[in-house]
């Protein structure tokens, strides 16, 4: 029985209940199925290796951060055929995130609005979950760990939170993502400004070099940016990434723009909009970044991928790898295999 058929059966039920409840139910079911060995034959990662940031990825289709914020479901997610998995965003201390409800479906737009607010159990619990996963213990694949700042940390001290998290997740990560682009943590996107970004990247790079010496292993750091930036901001970010010799950039996070979903139910809800409406703006940022960075720094493309053709468009815009999230909600895990097939390198 194919994952496409199974998801077609499950989707009407999942879409009939609260989006966050459906999210949690799906993850629990996947973890349970994996623990019982029921998922072992669902999907092996397609073999289409790509070397990016010095890492060889089994294939170029990954899971974006946000689905598994606490790293509690890694083994279940690893059965779906991803070339890499990114978990988080995690913060130094546990926090509940924003009040419920905080996730909304816009099915006519193949979109989601969320204002989760980095809800997570804190970095110590996160690291324990990663360590406990078979995926980590058996070195089964590529694991990205995504870090952020606590909501009650003043923006002027944000770098402290990133450094705390980097120190703790570094030994367990294939790569680390620095999330400065969620619209759901007050003032977070200020860190994309020239002086703020310079200060942040300088200290992250210094810590990375120290940790590489300490652990005898270099772990790449990628920066995750927003789609709601203009050409000048893109140039500023690109120059800072090059100046500080960062390892990669993930483009993009969710958008605060509502033009594409105007007058739809839930369109006025606060939060970040993901899915099909962010596809074009994300691609525009990727193209502009590619023009600035050339081949000096790889781009991981995320935002609005709902088909293999969409994944191809991200690569054509300048990305080296792609990530999925909202597309999985609307298309199910068959989307992973479809994207991997569409991106398969010619033999």
UniProtKB/Swiss-Prot annotation:
Keywords attached to this entry: Cell membrane, Flavoprotein, FMN, Membrane, Oxidoreductase, Pyrimidine biosynthesis
One GO MF term attached to the UniProt entry: dihydroorotate dehydrogenase (quinone) activity
This protein's record includes keyword Transcription regulation: no
Gene Ontology cellular component list: cytoplasm; plasma membrane
Database matches in InterPro entries: Aldolase_TIM, DHO_dehydrogenase, Dihydroorotate_DH_1_2, Dihydroorotate_DH_2, Dihydroorotate_DH_cat, Dihydroorotate_DH_CS
UniProt pathway annotation: Pyrimidine metabolism; UMP biosynthesis via de novo pathway; orotate from (S)-dihydroorotate (quinone route): step 1/1
Tree of life domain: Bacteria
Active site: 182
Cofactor note as given: Binds 1 FMN per subunit.
PROSITE patterns given in the database record: DHODEHASE_1, DHODEHASE_2
Cofactor(s) this protein cannot do without: FMN
Function: Catalyzes the conversion of dihydroorotate to orotate with quinone as electron acceptor.
Protein name: Dihydroorotate dehydrogenase (quinone)
The organism of origin for this protein: Herminiimonas arsenicoxydans
Designated gene of the protein: pyrD
